[in-house]
């Protein structure tokens, strides 16, 4: 999918919140409080350490940051959310490809996803096609709202 991806700004807050809110409220894929307000969610998404992007007409959004400080600062970390209306249209794949390139441009040497919920099988499969490997599984690390405690994966790839 060819999709214009650009840096996000304050003018994108409404559209980004429209993508974030249903995912946060569902509580099935992100370890974020389900009752977060718009202001709290946007403050998290636009944290000073995050470089934030939007895809297309805000079909999705992602942030890029260093996974750790000091000796771990060469490893990138991202969070991606695709709007419900754009699910299955290649938006997450396009954002991941963009983030890998942007991470290389910023000098990162690897990328790590810290908590990929194992029941989010579409995301796990997508990240694997993008070159990520499951390097660890955390038993019962995610409190799913309907399934109870489910496993979460740490996924990693070199850049």
Predicted regions and their residues:
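Acetyl-CoA-dependent GNAT
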Residues: 26-29, 33-85, 96-98, 102, ...
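Conserved acetyl-CoA-binding loop of GNAT-fold acetyltransferases
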Residues: 128-137
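Active-site acidic-Proline motif in GNAT/NAT acetyltransferases
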Residues: 80-85, 89, 117-119
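Terminal substrate-recognition subdomain of acyl/acetyltransferases
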Residues: 2, 80-81, 115, 144-159
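A short beta-loop-alpha structural element at the N-terminal edge
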Residues: 4-16
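Conserved acetyl-CoA-binding loop-helix of GNAT-fold acetyltransferases
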Residues: 88-105, 124-129
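Conserved GNAT acetyl-CoA-binding A-motif
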Residues: 103-116
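Conserved beta-strand-loop-alpha-helix junction that forms the acyl-donor binding cleft
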Residues: 113-123, 141-143
